[in-house]
């Protein structure tokens, strides 16, 4: 009886509304003191939210079911066709868990925040619920609203608690992300009103629609721009290094760990799932853009002398594998893209947290001024080394498995011609080779070499404290666990990914056989698969 009650519990609505509702309790806390009560309250709410998302996975989610589960559907504004529709399938559940997990650690990372702690933790909790909502909603208009909701906390967290150029970085972030979001609204309205006067924005309804080719291309291009900004895709990426360059450590963790994954998830959910004919035509472009991301960002990261910007460009490079996986038309490659999002969420959060912790001690981000601090911070060096090895895809860690899955899935799948696969894989390998070069050289510059006397004398360089070790340990544990046994994560989404890929392969086969790509470059790259 208890099990039946738990299975009927509105897990997803609770995981969205609980942190947002709890955030509105924070203004009633007293302003006196250092904000200790607010910190403990925010941490408690974030941990409970994480437990709620874990409960949704344990009590109501079937990993063998490819369909949307844990569905909650309440008519909200029927005249506008808007419903409170939430649910989770294999593509959203891992990211919901990742969001609540990273947010809880980000709250712990924000423990030293002394300036306006009430507002800071209020925004973090609102952001927690908003980001979970992005992955859980099953209505496209509601998706747009939640997509916009999480922009406000990020903007304020950058503009108020950022570095010297925080206003510029925050303004650039909001212009890029909010400006590109208009394409989501236009696509939602076009798809919701398609062929009817009564709008319906639910994903299940849109997936059943037979959108014509030109309509799909129109929506696909707009959504690719909007989601490409968030992923980000070169050349829509320039907001990210500026945002990371000014953000504090907990905001870093949320940006790298969760925000970028929203773009990859949305490409899978909308472009690949709802617009399969257009996806068949644009998938080769995604492959090319993914390779450009990997090489360009790796080269740029190699040249950076600012620690935050170096890691920011490294993130852009790693997200290129997500693009390749999404465009691969391979179950293995697309599964690798999903795993790469989870893996990079953990690795990116760990690296950016360490960047913040290192800056708190050295008060500089310039690599030229950091040499020789390893003698004073040996535990910090060990943490940096472990997380850097994870980022360069060391075997036994999650990054290795996800990148290998993407490469293998793309290269071995026969949807693309052999020359295209060989050329793209060879170019992407350049970025893979560059990654250990710039990461290991970064470690050498920070921790080894001749000590900077000015830095050593002026700063009391203390080693990592227990709170910092605990945060990194919490991130490294799943990184290593996934690296050793990937099925911990892949089993949760493989049924949904197989269903998605089958749908896209059918579109490719139909498109090629009907000469839909006749006279285009795509026609020379794609060939009809055997299904």
Curated annotation (Swiss-Prot):
GO biological process: ATP synthesis coupled electron transport; electron transport coupled proton transport
Subcellular location, principal: membrane
InterPro entries: NADH_Q_OxRdtase_chain4 (IPR022997), NADH_Q_OxRdtase_chainM/4 (IPR010227), NADH_UbQ_OxRdtase (IPR003918), ND/Mrp_TM (IPR001750)
Catalytic activity: a plastoquinone + NADH + (n+1) H(+)(in) = a plastoquinol + NAD(+) + n H(+)(out); a plastoquinone + NADPH + (n+1) H(+)(in) = a plastoquinol + NADP(+) + n H(+)(out)
Keywords: Membrane, NAD, NADP, Plastoquinone, Quinone, Thylakoid, Translocase, Transmembrane, Transmembrane helix
Lineage: superkingdom: Bacteria
Transmembrane segments: 9-29, 41-61, 93-113, 117-137, 141-161, 173-193, 217-237, 248-268, 282-302, 311-331, 337-357, 381-401, 422-442, 469-489
Membrane topology of this protein: Multi-pass membrane protein
GO cellular component, as recorded: plasma membrane-derived thylakoid membrane
GO molecular function ontology, one term from the record: ubiquinone binding
EC number: 7.1.1.-
Compartments it resides in: Cellular thylakoid membrane
Signal sequence interval, chain numbering: none
Role noted for this protein: NDH-1 shuttles electrons from NAD(P)H, via FMN and iron-sulfur (Fe-S) centers, to quinones in the respiratory chain. The immediate electron acceptor for the enzyme in this species is believed to be plastoquinone. Couples the redox reaction to proton translocation (for every two electrons transferred, four hydrogen ions are translocated across the cytoplasmic membrane), and thus conserves the redox energy in a proton gradient.
HAMAP family: NDH1_NuoM
Family: Belongs to the complex I subunit 4 family.
Protein name as it appears in the record: NAD(P)H-quinone oxidoreductase chain 4
Organism encoding this protein: Prochlorococcus marinus (strain MIT 9301)
């Amino acid at each position: 009886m208890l099990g039946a009650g738990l299975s009927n519990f509105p897990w997803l609505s609770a995981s969205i509304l609980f942190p947002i509702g709890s955030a509105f309790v924070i203004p009633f806390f007293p302003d006196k003191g250092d904000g200790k009560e607010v910190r403990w309250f925010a941490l408690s709410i974030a941990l409970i939210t994480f437990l709620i998302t874990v409960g949704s996975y344990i009590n109501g989610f079937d990993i063998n079911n490819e369909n949307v589960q844990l569905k909650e559907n309440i008519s909200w504004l029927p005249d506008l066709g808007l419903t409170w529709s939430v649910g989770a399938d294999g593509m959203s559940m891992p990211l919901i868990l990742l969001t609540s997990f990273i947010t809880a650690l980000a709250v712990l990372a924000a423990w030293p925040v002394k300036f306006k702690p009430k507002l800071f933790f209020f925004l973090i909790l609102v952001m927690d619920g908003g980001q979970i909502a992005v992955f859980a909603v099953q209505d496209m208009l509601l998706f747009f609203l939640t997509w916009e909701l999480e922009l406000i906390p990020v903007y304020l967290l950058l503009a108020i608690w950022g570095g010297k150029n925080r206003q510029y970085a925050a303004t650039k972030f909001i212009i890029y992300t909010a400006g590109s979001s208009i394409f989501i609204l236009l696509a939602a309205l076009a798809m919701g009103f398609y062929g009817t006067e009564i709008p319906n924005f639910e994903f299940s309804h849109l997936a059943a629609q037979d959108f014509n080719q030109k309509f799909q291309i129109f929506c696909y291009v707009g959504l690719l721009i909007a989601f490409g900004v968030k992923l980000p895709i070169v050349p829509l990426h320039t907001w990210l290094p500026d945002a990371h360059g000014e953000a504090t450590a907990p905001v870093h963790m949320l940006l790298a760990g969760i925000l970028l994954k929203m773009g990859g998830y949305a490409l899978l959910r909308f472009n690949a799932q709802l617009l399969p004919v257009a996806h068949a035509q644009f998938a080769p472009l995604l492959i090319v853009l993914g390779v450009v991301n990997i090489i360009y960002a790796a080269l740029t990261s190699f040249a950076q002398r600012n620690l935050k910007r170096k890691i920011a460009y490294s993130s852009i490079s790693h997200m290129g594998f997500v693009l390749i996986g999404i465009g691969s038309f391979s179950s293995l490659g697309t599964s690798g893209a999903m795993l790469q999002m989870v893996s990079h969420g953990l690795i990116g959060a760990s690296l950016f947290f360490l960047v913040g912790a290192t800056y708190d001690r050295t008060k500089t981000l310039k690599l030229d001024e950091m040499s020789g601090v390893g003698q004073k911070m040996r535990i910090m060096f060990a943490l940096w080394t472990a997380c850097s090895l994870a980022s360069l895809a060391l075997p036994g860690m999650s990054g290795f498995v996800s990148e290998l899955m993407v490469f293998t899935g793309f290269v071995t799948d026969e949807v693309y011609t052999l020359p295209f696969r060989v050329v793209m894989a060879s170019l992407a390998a350049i970025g893979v080779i560059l990654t250990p070069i710039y990461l290991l050289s970064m470690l050498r510059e920070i921790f080894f070499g001749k000590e900077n006397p000015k830095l050593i004398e002026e700063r009391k360089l203390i080693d990592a404290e227990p709170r910092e070790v605990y945060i990194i340990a919490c991130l490294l544990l799943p990184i290593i666990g996934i690296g050793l046994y990937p099925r911990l994560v892949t089993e949760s989404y493989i049924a949904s990914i197989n269903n998605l890929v089958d749908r896209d392969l059918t579109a490719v086969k139909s498109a090629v056989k009907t000469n839909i790509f006749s006279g285009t470059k795509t026609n020379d790259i794609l060939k009809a698969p055997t299904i």
